[in-house]
Each structure stands twice: as structure tokens, then as C-alpha cells.
């Protein structure tokens, strides 16, 4: 049986990937209720954005794939680097420095824990031959 995954992607988020990865690492592998609680009380700029993305992925799973909300967990979540917007910062004597405003692409995949159990059972039954 193929596992059903629900996915949500946020692109061109104006948060540096390094800062977004700090928040993303907190919720990897957690169930949805735990992840929402963690994100609600995390005092980082990326936390509300990732919470909104998590809620979007949950809605995709419940409405499109008809999965049970209580059995969902974060299967994988990662942050890729987006565009770098180059801006000038004025310095002394008419010179300037380049500032790179970094953006992020955040991908979140959730799946049902029943899918995980059935795939483990299939692997175990297949290895006993």
C-alpha cells in the first residue's frame, strides 16, 4: 500500500534560511498537536509562518486525502534557499556595501501514523520468507 502524504510549500518567504531551520528542527517527527503547540510558543519570526504552513498541510490532508486529523504527524520538513535580493548599504566617503536579503522556500510533508504502521508490518512480513 502506498502511503498518502499531504504537502504544503511556502515560497519566497523573507526570512533567512538559517533562521527558519532553527524553528523547523523543533517540529520534525512530531504529531500535529505537539507541533502546533511548539510553534505557538516559539518566540522566533519564522514560527507563525511555519504554523500557517502546517495548518495548510493539515487542511490538504483532511480535505483532499480524507485522512484522520488525530493520526497525522510531520513526516519531513526542510528549508531551501530562495532568491537573494541584493541591496546597497551606504558607507563612508560615498562608497557602499552589498547587503544580501535572503529568502526561503519551506516544504512540509505530513502523513498518517496508520500508514507508517501498515508499511512496517508489510516490511516485517516480507522479511520472514
Swiss-Prot record:
Q: Which residues form the signal peptide?
A: none
GO-annotated biological processes: translation
Which domain of life does this protein belong to?
Bacteria
Which PROSITE patterns does the protein's record reference? RIBOSOMAL_L22
Molecular function terms from GO: rRNA binding; structural constituent of ribosome
Cellular component terms per the entry's GO annotation: cytosolic large ribosomal subunit
Q: What keywords tag this UniProt record?
A: Ribonucleoprotein, Ribosomal protein, RNA-binding, rRNA-binding
Pfam families, alphabetized: Ribosomal_L22
InterPro entries linked: Ribosomal_uL22, Ribosomal_uL22_bac/chlpt-type, Ribosomal_uL22_bac/org-type, Ribosomal_uL22_CS, Ribosomal_uL22_sf
What does this chain do?
This protein binds specifically to 23S rRNA; its binding is stimulated by other ribosomal proteins, e.g. L4, L17, and L20. It is important during the early stages of 50S assembly. It makes multiple contacts with different domains of the 23S rRNA in the assembled 50S subunit and ribosome. The globular domain of the protein is located near the polypeptide exit tunnel on the outside of the subunit, while an extended beta-hairpin is found that lines the wall of the exit tunnel in the center of the 70S ribosome.
What family does this chain come from, according to its entry?
Answer: Belongs to the universal ribosomal protein uL22 family.
Which PANTHER family would you find in this protein's record? CHLOROPLAST 50S RIBOSOMAL PROTEIN L22-RELATED (PTHR13501), LARGE RIBOSOMAL SUBUNIT PROTEIN UL22M (PTHR13501:SF8)
Q: How does it assemble?
A: Part of the 50S ribosomal subunit.
Listed name of the protein: Large ribosomal subunit protein uL22
Q: What organism does this protein naturally occur in? A: Onion yellows phytoplasma (strain OY-M)
Classification from the root reads:
Bacteria, Bacillati, Mycoplasmatota, Mollicutes, Acholeplasmatales
